[in-house]
Curated annotation (Swiss-Prot):
Protein task: The RecF protein is involved in DNA metabolism; it is required for DNA replication and normal SOS inducibility. RecF binds preferentially to single-stranded, linear DNA. It also seems to bind ATP.
Record-level GO BP terms: DNA replication; DNA synthesis involved in DNA repair; double-strand break repair; SOS response
Keyword annotations of the record: ATP-binding, Cytoplasm, DNA damage, DNA repair, DNA replication, DNA-binding, Nucleotide-binding, SOS response
Domain of life of the native organism: Bacteria
The protein's name: DNA replication and repair protein RecF
GO molecular function (one): single-stranded DNA binding
GO CC annotation, single: cytoplasm
Keyword Glycosyltransferase: no
PROSITE patterns (alphabetical): RECF_1, RECF_2
Main location: cytoplasm
SUPFAM superfamilies the UniProt entry points to: P-loop containing nucleoside triphosphate hydrolases
Length: 359
């Protein structure tokens, strides 16, 4: 479901742009600071309701402007052109419009415009804490299980209530009512996540083997508590410890994706270039799995394509992305870095001082 038109106004250094992207590869060529990453950021905002570089609306709205606009049109699977848009104010107020209707939720944007982002800071998926890998898992579960979004929101609220009660409760029975519902939802979320990871593993390990054939890569899911013990028992058994800590130690909020290379944690073995290839492999695998399960196509956003990758690795990634037949936006400093990826269906956009021109 590619974007057929992208309109950006008052976004960072982009005063206004209106482009018609290819359904295949789209190359954004320009010097550092030219605005090419801002185009990717605008597409990301359109699908997520937030920037991948800043959580503050004021930092992405153009200086001396009170708001920004990003609008797009994309082709649905039945060849219907669907308009979507987002408007952000400096105070953080956000308005989402889908098919002409205002008041839509950010989650609905994510449903209609699934995106995968690969950028220079993307190593955190593999090298930082488990929250990044939980977000990776939950992106897939969100798109495959209709009940996940509401259930996960409820779990986070129940956890917050439980943590507050831990500070005042004198006996476990004061928490048992809340814990029944928390345990029920946590078990459902854990099962959804486990099922998703099991399905994704086959695709991901195959692509990882293509990108990094010299390594044996294994991916496993950790649910956040002992796999042989019901969560309700964990909550009751750990009541006193949780009280001492002041928060709920075990649960779906501690889930993780364990990735090992030749039996060793991935961050202890791979170089930066190899880590980037693995991140790319995981993102592409997630997009392919989405297509297999739902028929939806991801849009891939790749910032600073050449970073950490030699020409051979770039060619390997380009070949894999072309095989997905998905829409891809790629930023690069020079056209030489993406020359091998260019074909008759791709489009090149030159970016300079926030001005975008097709060329």
């Amino acid at each position: 479901m590619p974007l057929s038109r992208l309109i950006v106004k008052q976004f960072r250094n982009i005063e206004a742009c209106d482009i018609q992207p290819s359904s295949g590869f789209n190359f954004l060529i320009g010097a550092n600071g030219s605005g090419k990453t801002s185009v990717l950021e605008a597409v990301y905002l359109l699908g997520h309701g937030r920037s991948f570089k800043s959580s503050l609306s004021g930092r992405i709205i153009q200086n001396e402007c009170s708001e920004l606009f990003v609008h797009g049109r994309f082709m649905t699977s039945d060849q219907f052109e669907l308009p979507i848009g987002i408007n952000k104010q400096r105070d953080g107020t956000t308005e989402v419009k889908i098919s002409g209707q205002t008041g839509q939720k950010l989650a609905q944007l994510a449903q209609v415009l699934p995106l995968q982002l690969i950028h220079p800071e993307g190593f955190d998926l593999l090298t930082d804490g488990p929250k990044h890998r939980r977000a990776f898992i939950d992106w897939g579960v969100f798109h495959s299980e209709s009940g996940f979004y509401d259930a996960w929101g409820r779990v986070k609220r129940l956890n917050k209530q439980r943590n507050a009660l831990l500070k005042t409760a004198t006996h476990y029975r004061e928490l048992s009512y809340w814990d029944q519902e928390l345990a029920r939802l946590a078990e459902s979320i854990s099962q959804w996540r486990a099922t998703y990871v099991e399905q994704l593993k086959e695709v991901a390990e195959e692509i990882c083997a293509t990108f990094l054939p010299e390594f044996e890569i294994k991916i496993n899911y950790y649910r956040g508590w002992d796999k042989d013990t019901p969560y309700a028992e964990i909550l009751e058994k750990n009541f006193e410890r949780d009280q001492q800590l002041g928060y709920t130690f075990s649960g779906p909020n501690k889930a993780d994706l364990k990735i090992k290379v030749n039996g060793t944690p991935v961050e202890d073995v791979l170089s930066r270039g190899q880590l980037k290839l693995m991140v790319c492999a995981l993102r592409v695998a997630q997009g392919q799995h989405l297509t297999q399960m739902t028929g939806k196509q991801c849009i891939y956003l790749i910032d600073d394509f050449a970073s950490e990758l030699d020409s051979q690795r770039r060619a390997r990634l380009a070949e894999c992305l072309k095989a997905t037949q998905a829409q891809v936006f790629v930023s690069s400093i020079t056209a030489d870095q993406i020359a091998d990826m260019h074909d008759e269906n791709s489009r090149m956009f030159h970016v300079e001082h926030g001005k975008i021109e097709q060329g």
